[in-house]
A protein has these predicted regions:
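Short, glycine/charged-enriched secondary-structure capping and boundary segments
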Residues: 116-117, 161-163, 183
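Substrate-binding cleft/loops of secretory-pathway carbohydrate-active enzymes
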Residues: 147-177
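Generic local-structure boundary detector
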Residues: 85, 111-113, 155-159, 177-181
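Metal-dependent peptidase/peptidase-like ectodomains
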Residues: 172-173, 178-191, 201
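Alpha-helical scaffolding within the catalytic cores
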Residues: 149-159, 182-194
């Protein structure tokens, strides 16, 4: 909790003033070189609920005894095949784009089926299933970059190293940005160090 008089300082993603952006050495584009329609939180774009949920609930997250269209089941081989095909189609549609996001949707209802849970336990984090899944996608597109999120339940680093063409977008949304992260966001700082041991491709 913040004490009275304290404020959280949030970085701006978009810079309306080009002079200010130049001074700060920040691009005015929030996602340069990305496929325009696949920049972040993309799972629902690859497997839309309205297209797949009724006929293939097994493609989606198991929570308790229910399949929910909140996230994907990342150990289902058919899900992997569909995502690979979707990524290929988008790169064909936007040949100048160099990066696409293959990333969780904006909720914490990730799959807890036996297969996904086993991997997450082995990896020490739910990022385990994510990185293994994203690596499988990235292996098909060696000349492109596949971005994914280290966010909420996937922020803690796993054991599997991302491939060289995988970009980790590490999110500091929970942090108080009015002070150095080592002072007021130690968990994030530790996660940053952990991911840094696995890859040099980190975007914050």
């Amino acid at each position: 909790m913040f004490e009275k008089g304290e404020e959280t300082v949030h970085s701006r993603l978009f810079y309306d003033n080009p002079d200010y952006a130049e001074q700060q050495k920040v691009t005015q584009e929030s996602f340069p070189t990305y496929v325009p329609s696949a920049r972040v939180h993309t799972f629902h774009k690859f497997l839309p609920e309205e297209k797949f949920y009724k006929s293939h609930p097994e493609y989606f997250a198991l929570r308790g005894d229910q399949r929910l269209p909140t996230q994907l089941c990342l150990t289902n081989p058919e899900v992997l095949a569909i995502v690979k095909d979707s990524v290929a189609s988008l790169f064909e549609q936007y040949p100048q784009s160099k990066v696409i996001s293959v990333s969780q949707d904006d909720n914490q209802q990730h799959c807890q089926c036996d297969n996904c849970s086993k991997i997450d336990e082995e990896e020490g984090s739910a990022s385990g299933t994510m990185i293994r899944f994203v690596n499988e996608v990235a292996a098909n597109f060696p000349d492109k970059m596949i971005s994914t999120l280290a966010y909420q339940y996937t922020r803690k680093p796993c054991k599997t190293k991302p491939l060289e063409n995988v970009l980790i977008t590490l999110t500091s949304i929970e942090c108080d940005r009015s002070a150095p992260i080592a002072e007021k966001c130690a968990d994030f700082a530790n996660d940053l160090v952990g991911w840094g041991k696995l890859t040099q491709n980190i975007r914050i």
